[in-house]
Regions:
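Alpha/beta-hydrolase-fold enzymes
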Residues: 231-332
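Catalytic-loop region of hydrolases
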Residues: 32-113, 428-453
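Conserved hydrolase catalytic core segment
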Residues: 205-209, 213-249
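Conserved alpha/beta-hydrolase "acid-adjacent" motif
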Residues: 374-380
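Cap/lid segment of the alpha/beta-hydrolase catalytic domain
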Residues: 142, 146, 150-200, 248-279
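Catalytic histidine-centered segment of alpha/beta-hydrolase-like enzymes
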Residues: 399-410
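Short beta-strand/loop motif that positions the catalytic acidic residue
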Residues: 361, 367-369
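N-terminal cap/lid subdomain of alpha/beta-hydrolase-fold enzymes
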Residues: 97-174
Length: 453
């Protein structure tokens, strides 16, 4: 009986965590007019007062980056890109939250920065809530990650939480351009934030570039673009990918279906996504609800989904004509989200593939992944790690699948802290006995030859 009670308690905890993931991510009410921007400045508005913005005039979005050229040639974006000013809009803006203790060289430049790139639907306020010490979202991550004495120690590092081009505090389609907004790439996300770090915050080098999910993907790109010059000293992608085109069939399939869900909305089809002239209550929000429902089906392991009571599940199941609590989770969520913003976010991944460029990475590299991730398969992450000289690969299993990326720094606490602090030894801490509390995760670390670099 005692064992059964424990199993039941664990099951309840897992179901509760799965539901928490849905509601922990951005969601707030939007006024019924069509004033721009259509979406808020922050994913977690309670932390909006901490966010700062920076303008980058005449930045070319959507251009081609020649990685063999001097990085100064991409200072204002890739060749052939489009500036927002040329479309009659304000200059490009980026946003961030900074905490910690800056240490400066004799030129007054910061030399101890750690950057935290944001995930697919989030921003700096979300990552601050989940990871910074003492915030209400810490429980979602199994505890704080950033703060005094934490894995990323703010007594030792200057930590910058970054927004990513296309959502929340950065320039985005829902600022008013809609489908006229230039298509952007992960290279654009990184380059705009490089300009923020270098020009505005006067950061001379980044000790570690990290992030979860799409934030991890950006960390990979930081390594490709800015480790050869020494600007980025180490990268720590947690649950990211180095390709989301045909080199990753499951990932590409998943997000192509997500894109198709947006486009399936009759209001989208009637306007071809050009609907900003309509009242907000006539925008194609159901397609966005459909997208989230599709993604969430495999956002957690099937045992988690199977253990969730139907009266809770149907809040996450998409219905074209919902009744009662059907689709309630997504109806609430998309009130402050715009379908065009997410259409562009999805589009940015379909042509993304840096596998052939991984050899450019000269940074210390720790690749962290969740073995049970059903969106971004662990075998692909392992292959990417093997392509980088001296990279270390660490993984663990968790029933919350992809969403376990947020708790990874606490599951692999010793390994990650020693990597961040550059105190790795041959014993590689955290190999045995690591667990995620109720999740029963088992951690493993692999050390290829040539770690010391």
């Amino acid at each position: 009986m005692k064992t059964n009670m424990r199993k039941a308690d664990v099951k309840k905890q897992i179901v509760a965590l799965a539901l928490a993931a849905v509601f922990a991510l951005p969601g707030a009410a939007l006024a019924a007019d069509t004033k721009f921007p259509l979406t808020p400045n922050s994913g977690s508005m309670e932390f909006d007062h901490l966010k700062r913005q920076y303008e980058i005039p005449n930045f070319r979005i959507g251009g081609k980056y020649n990685l063999d050229a001097d990085p100064e040639t991409w200072r204002n974006g890739g060749e052939g890109g489009t500036t927002l000013e040329s479309l009659g809009a304000a200059p490009l803006k980026v946003a961030y939250i900074a905490v910690g203790t800056p240490r400066r060289n004799d030129r007054g430049e910061i030399i101890n920065a750690v950057i935290v790139n944001t995930f697919y639907s989030g921003d700096s306020t979300n990552m601050y809530n989940f990871w910074y010490d003492g915030q209400p979202g810490n429980g979602f991550s199994g505890g704080a990650v950033v703060g005094p004495g934490k894995a990323i120690d703010t007594n030792r590092y200057y930590v910058v939480f970054l927004d990513a081009l296309g959502l929340w505090g950065t320039s985005k389609p829902s600022d008013g351009l809609g489908r006229k907004f230039p298509s952007y790439s992960y290279f654009d996300m990184v380059q705009t934030n490089y300009r923020l770090l270098r020009d505005h915050l006067k950061i001379a080098q980044v000790e570690v570039a990290t992030g979860v999910s799409m934030g991890a993907t950006q960390s990979w790109v930081w390594g490709v673009m800015y480790s050869p010059s020494g600007f980025v000293k180490a990268i720590m992608p947690i649950g990211g990918t180095t390709a989301s085109d045909g080199d990753d069939p499951i990932g590409a399939w998943t997000f192509l279906l997500a894109q198709s869900a947006i486009e399936s909305d009759p209001k989208w089809r009637a306007t071809n996504g050009n609907y900003y002239h309509l009242p907000v209550d006539q925008h194609p929000k159901q397609g966005l609800q459909f997208m989230w429902s599709r993604l969430q089906l495999t956002g957690f392991t099937f045992p988690v989904r199977s253990a969730t009571p139907w009266d809770r599940i149907e809040r996450e199941v998409f219905y074209w004509e919902p009744k009662g609590n059907q689709s309630a989770a997504w109806i609430a969520r998309v009130k402050n989200e715009d379908p065009v913003d997410f259409w562009y976010r999805n589009d940015s991944g379909f042509n993304y593939n840096i596998n052939k460029d991984l050899k450019r990475i000269k940074a210390r590299t720790l690749v962290v992944h969740v073995d049970t991730d059903m969106w971004l398969i662990v075998d692909n992450a392992r292959k990417s790690a093997k392509a980088v000289d001296g990279a270390v690969f660490a993984s663990f299993s968790d029933p919350t699948a992809h969403y376990a990326v947020f708790k990874a720094p606490n599951v692999l606490k010793d390994t990650i802290k020693s990597f961040v602090d550059n105190t790795f030894t041959t014993s590689l801490p955290g190999i045995a006995g690591a667990s995620s509390g109720g999740g029963g995760a088992q951690a493993a670390v692999e050390k290829p030859a040539g770690l010391a670099k």
